Amino acid sequence: MAFKKPQITEVKTDIQSLSIYLRSVKKFGKTTLFRDLVLEKFGDPTKGLLVGCGAEMGYTILDNLNATQVEDWDDMEDLKDWLIEEKGKEHDIKMVAFDVVGELIPIAEEKIIRMSTKETGKVCKSFNSAFGGYGEPRKRLLKLLKEYFSALKKAGIMPFAISHTKVKSIKEKGDDTEGYNTLTSDLSNDCEGIFGDIFDCVLTGCIDREVKDGKVTTEVRKLYFRGNGYIDAGCRFANDAVPEYIVFDKPNMAKDFIKVLEDGLKKSRTNKITDEEFKEKQRKEVIELDKQVEQIRENKELSIETKTEIIDKVKANLSKIEIADLKAIMT
């Protein structure tokens, strides 16, 4: 990997440059929001892709949605290769949603089991015993997830992860109190940490209900962009660049959703610009995103060519080459 010279960073301007992790209670409207987001932003359903994961098929009664299904990790790898290799050829997908990422965990665990059998030469029958057990299976799992979504981001294809929520009891290390409750995702803490680290926006949807005499009198749907002690949420924006939450009360929330995030990007800039300048930067930014996938493809082709040259060199000198020299060539 070639050294990249340092350069001054600049805040992104377009929602296409954001990786988004959305958690909420079931039937909140997460999948519908992604569908509406694609249509509002691009006016074309083929610009987005909804990936149903494992047993989750939350898109079967939504129309105007570009969708596919993955059943195992090989499907995930094939999907990633297709997204990167065929962008600008078979497709022009800008955003990819994974619904729900909780279903990816058992899929990834099965992949780790197969990897263990292949790499160690010993039959592995359970995830916890993979690669000798202890903490190694979890390390491999987290690495697999992180590398997958990071690869998409590097290629300029921003992932949109969807998950369910769960109230968890949190107790900090060294804290003698009983801890506190927080509304976060239903993933294990280490997997949740991976998505929290990778994604730019960690959003949480919930429903506030007022109950009187054992009956719900009112309910308000809210989508949180910033946490409040109980709600776990946050974005990589400047302070107060986005509201704590928006009321999620319209049949189509896409326009409001896009405005909040793109306004947040604009407010996060240290040097203020006009709306016209902002739109021009958005236009250039989208072009640069498309160039990223081209660079990934070029790097991959160069890597393949280099390996081929090494193999040809070994074949040509196999009869006279020493083992020490062979190691030097391969490294």
Language-model features: where?
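P-loop NTPase motor core
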Residues: 103-190
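Structured loop/turn residues at beta-strand edges in well-structured enzyme cores
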Residues: 91, 155, 197
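Interfaces that engage single-stranded nucleic acids at replication/repair/recombination sites
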Residues: 3-24, 28-30, 71, 77, ...
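Conserved P-loop
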Residues: 10-98, 103-107
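Phosphate-binding/switch region of NTP-binding enzymes
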Residues: 159-240
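Surface-exposed alpha-helical segments enriched in charged/polar residues
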Residues: 81-85, 146-150, 294
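Eukaryote-biased recognition of electropositive, low-complexity segments
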Residues: 206-280
